[in-house]
Amino acid sequence: MAYDDERDLVAAAAVVLDGATLATVAEATAVGRISFPYVPGLLAFREIPTVLAALDALPCPPGLVVCDGYGLAHPRRFGLASHLGVLTGLPTIGVAKNPFTFAFAAPATPRGSTAALLAGTEEVGRALRTRDSVKPVFVSVGHRVGLANACAHTLALTPAHRLPETTRRADALCRRALREAGGATS
């Protein structure tokens, strides 16, 4: 997602990668008007319409949707990844840059190390180290994927960087879509 608050625009991108090579198979973007105010914890309502438009524009459905945000690891236990998964029926996971409000112990320094992301005693996700000695990402289930598989998919999508390739490529596409948007919106 990328926002242009001056023009009241939001851009979303969907990127489908080959699971074995991480080569781009398909990509699509959508640009729309911001139709929901910024409310912490309710970003899904602000982002979902444009995300759905980007997913609908893909020539092939993704086998897994990796959201730059949360699923179960959300104060309401229903973040963007959960919301999107329920609406589309697609398997979804959330991979966030920050832990939101949840407690966690730092995972060990090697790539692949994890630590539980806790809401009280409930494990709502995992802090996952995707690079040796680099700040972890925060993985949570969204829809139709277990936590261990969500972590395994995240590691497969992070061979060289902290963030999943899907997120990195989608971020670049969103920024480009906003630059090219001019007055055209979906």
PLM regions and their residue ranges:
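C-terminal binding/interaction regions
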Residues: 48, 97-98, 106-186
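A glycine-rich, hydrophobic loop/mini-helix early in the fold
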Residues: 6-61
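Flexible, glycine/proline-enriched loop segments at strand-loop-helix junctions
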Residues: 38-42, 67-75, 134-141
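Catalytic-site beta-strand/loop segments enriched in glycine and acidic/polar residues
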Residues: 52-84, 88-90
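Two-metal-ion RNase H-like nuclease active-site motif
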Residues: 1-4
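Feature detects long, helix-prone N-terminal segments enriched in hydrophobes
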Residues: 65, 101, 105-106
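Short hydrophobic alpha-helical runs that function as membrane-insertion/retention elements
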Residues: 91-96
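Short, ordered loop/turn segments at secondary-structure junctions
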Residues: 70-71, 97-100
